[in-house]
């Protein structure tokens, strides 16, 4: 490093800058190797174990049963879907065998592909399946006219099968379109009457799609409005637990992400995402539930905002704790021998000011003129009563992050929470 420093004096060339950057990278690699040398120590392993979230191992039968057992009840959407799927598949097989349908397996395949765990996904699949089948039948009926040779039909079968697997995960209507062309072309190669199979294909698709729609509508339907109250309660409670964990870390001055804190943080985000997904699914449920769904739709925005503000508070608390110094700006107001924690260095708001600003932020609108004047007067009063060396605890955040027009009244949000 000294030789490179002497060489770079008065010589600012690109080669010297590249050598300096390479030397820094080599030093970083050397430091990582030095840390790996001591990574096998028990203390290091214990510390690393505290920062990981253990996943449930399913390699043995015991662990597999522990993962499956909580789902064996009607409150589990997975269990309801499994029972629903089994019953409708049995009904489809019974219809095919009783009526002795030649191509009746198309009903079973439609039923298996279309039926989804919830009403919204099944409804979308029903429309896509019928539309793709009808268009595929129209295009497939033209194949014998333009492709009389066997080689061309084989290429169409290969292309249709390949495109089916390429599009089945992100655009189901396209995959249905391609597989219908492939099926009709395969029947033409087998020497069967394609034009006699076309109406059968459409009828079987409609029967299978109707069975799938009836199953999700009447066999333990997964109407989201039935679980909305519980989902919202879980979102609020998990966010409250997350906030409580942050407050405890502020009091103790803890900086590490232990496993309990990470689990609490993950659950808060998962429950908030579940609430948003529930409200999104409710918007596409039948119109007869509109009276229940419409008043609940504005709940997603304040719930997401609440979790976001708590996450920002946790990040700020970690930075305050990390940067806490033994000599604090207002250490004269603390009792003797008080440890320097982030709760002593972070600014605080009184409950009224915090509640007012949270409501305005959740509504995505700037505070009104009277509220701003009142907050300014409160800030001036608190700053005049504070010590000369202390920071202003009531400084309001800037409005540069508030964008968009208000969509929800602050009073309604306050009443909801």
From Swiss-Prot:
Region of interest called Disordered, as start-end residue ranges on this chain: 366-417
Pfam families cross-referenced by the UniProt entry: FUSC_2
Biased composition (Low complexity): 366-398
Keywords: Cell membrane, Membrane, Transmembrane, Transmembrane helix
Residue ranges of coiled coil: none
Record InterPro entries: Memb_transporter_dom
Transmembrane regions: 87-107, 130-150, 177-197, 202-222
Compartments it resides in: Cell membrane
Family in the record: Belongs to the YccS/YhfK family.
Name of the protein described by the UniProt record: Uncharacterized protein ORF2
Organism: Neisseria gonorrhoeae
């Amino acid at each position: 490093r000294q030789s490179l420093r002497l060489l770079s004096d008065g010589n600012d060339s690109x080669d010297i800058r590249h050598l300096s950057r390479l030397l820094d990278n080599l030093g970083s690699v050397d430091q990582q190797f030095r840390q790996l040398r001591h990574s096998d120590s028990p203390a290091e392993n214990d510390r690393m174990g505290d920062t990981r979230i253990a996943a449930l191992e399913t390699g043995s039968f015991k662990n597999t049963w522990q993962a499956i057992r909580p789902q064996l009840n009607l409150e589990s959407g997975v269990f309801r879907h499994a029972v629903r799927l089994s019953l409708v598949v049995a009904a489809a097989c019974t219809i095919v065998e009783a009526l002795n349908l030649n191509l009746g397996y198309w009903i079973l395949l439609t039923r298996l592909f279309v039926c989804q765990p919830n009403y919204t996904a099944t409804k979308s699949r029903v429309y896509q399946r019928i539309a793709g089948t009808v268009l595929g039948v129209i295009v497939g009926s033209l194949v014998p006219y333009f492709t009389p040779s066997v080689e061309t039909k084989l290429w169409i079968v290969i292309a249709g099968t390949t495109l089916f697997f390429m599009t089945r995960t992100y655009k189901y209507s396209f995959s249905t379109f391609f597989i219908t062309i492939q099926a009709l072309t395969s029947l033409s190669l087998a020497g069967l009457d394609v034009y006699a199979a076309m109406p059968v294909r459409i009828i079987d698709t409609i029967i299978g799609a109707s069975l799938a729609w009836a199953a999700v509508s009447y066999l333990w339907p997964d109407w989201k409005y039935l679980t909305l109250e519980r989902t919202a309660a879980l979102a609020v409670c998990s966010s409250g637990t997350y906030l409580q964990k942050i407050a405890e870390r502020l009091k103790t001055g803890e900086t590490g992400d232990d496993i309990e804190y990470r689990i609490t943080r993950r659950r808060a985000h998962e429950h908030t995402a579940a609430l948003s997904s529930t409200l999104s699914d409710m918007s596409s449920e039948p119109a007869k539930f509109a009276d229940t769904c419409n008043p609940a739709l504005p709940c997603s925005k304040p719930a997401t905002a609440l979790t976001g503000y708590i996450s920002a508070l946790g990040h700020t608390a970690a930075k305050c704790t990390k940067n806490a110094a033994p000599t604090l700006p207002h250490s004269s107001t603390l009792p003797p021998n008080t440890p320097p924690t982030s709760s002593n260095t972070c600014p605080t708001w009184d409950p009224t000011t915090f509640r007012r600003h949270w409501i305005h932020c959740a509504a995505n609108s700037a505070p009104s003129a009277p509220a701003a004047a009142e907050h300014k007067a409160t800030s001036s009063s608190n700053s005049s009563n504070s010590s000369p060396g202390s920071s202003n605890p009531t400084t309001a955040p800037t409005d540069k992050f508030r964008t968009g027009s208000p969509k929800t009244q602050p009073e309604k949000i306050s009443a909801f929470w």
